[in-house]
A protein has these predicted regions:
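Active-site-adjacent beta->alpha loops and helix N-cap segments on the catalytic face
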Residues: 1-4, 83-96, 138-152
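Alpha-helix N-cap and loop-to-helix initiation/capping positions
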Residues: 42-53, 57, 83-95, 165-173, ...
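Active-site-proximal beta-alpha loop/turn segments in soluble metabolic enzymes
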Residues: 40-47, 73-85, 159, 194-201
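Conserved, mostly hydrophobic/aromatic
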Residues: 6, 58, 65, 92, ...
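Short beta-strand segments at enzyme active-site cores
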Residues: 16-19, 66-77, 106-112, 191-195
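Active-site-proximal loop/short-helix segments
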Residues: 19-39, 68-91
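Catalytic-face loop-and-helix region of soluble metabolic enzyme cores
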Residues: 100-221
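Active-site-proximal, glycine-rich beta->alpha crossover segments in alpha/beta enzymes
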Residues: 1-64
Length: 221
């Protein structure tokens, strides 16, 4: 009902984006591992939770959000960087096959902090996954992901930590961000959804948020 109520209040030209937590991120938080640095090899117990418990529930949740009117649903997998490379690739195949492939171009994926985006793109291509798009965190060079042959949107990736800085510092960095994005042709950046590398931090000045939105619209619309 919350999605339906929100849509009722949105103008017709605004979209509703739903979200779910990534399976491993949910396990990581539930087991108190979310603050852990470094990579992990998943135990049989953890794989069983992901495959037998979480995947079916998350698939059902995505379906419910789309039926309620969400245009797309993002998978936020902020702890995926904890997985070692072998487990990460195995994990991504499960997420793509069991969740994303059931909802053609209706599910996007976001991970952060050193996650291997090249592996994500490789697996997406290998499995012909109909991914709606990919969120990129602010540690990456966003222009590396612009390609006219790319399928799906690219979302990101101004540094959310800069947003909490004094306005003059934030504005200076935003100008540099805009200059770099503007160096890429319009054809290459088709499908770019401008945003932050992660969410808005709670200490972000409202003035900075308003300026960011205004400046981006003036620069690219």
């Amino acid at each position: 009902r919350q999605i339906e109520r929100t849509i009722e209040k949105l103008p017709n030209d605004k979209s509703m984006i739903g979200f779910i937590g990534g399976p491993w991120t949910l396990v990581s938080y539930a087991m108190g591992k979310n603050k852990k640095n470094g990579t992990d090899k998943l135990s049989k117990f953890e794989w069983n939770i992901i495959n037998d418990k979480l995947i079916p529930l998350l698939k059902q949740n995505v379906s419910m959000q789309l039926e309620a009117g969400a245009e797309i649903v993002m998978i936020f997998d902020s702890a995926a960087n904890q997985l070692n490379e072998i487990d990460f690739e195995k994990y991504m195949r499960i997420v793509f096959k069991e969740i994303v492939s059931n909802f053609e171009k209706k599910v996007g994926y976001y991970a952060k902090d050193g996650v291997n985006y090249s592996s994500i793109e490789m697996i997406k291509t290998e499995l012909s996954v109909p991914l709606a798009g990919l969120g990129i965190d602010s540690n990456e060079s966003l222009t590396d992901f612009f390609n006219p042959s790319r399928k799906g949107f690219i979302q990101g990736n101004f540094d959310e930590k800069i947003m909490i800085q004094p306005p003059e510092i934030m504005k200076e960095n935003l100008d540099k961000f805009i200059e770099k994005i503007s160096s890429v042709s319009i054809e290459e950046r088709v499908g770019w959804v401008c945003g932050l590398g992660h969410g808005v931090l709670k200490t972000t000045p409202e003035e900075n948020v308003k300026f960011f939105v205004k400046k981006i619209r003036e620069s690219f619309v």
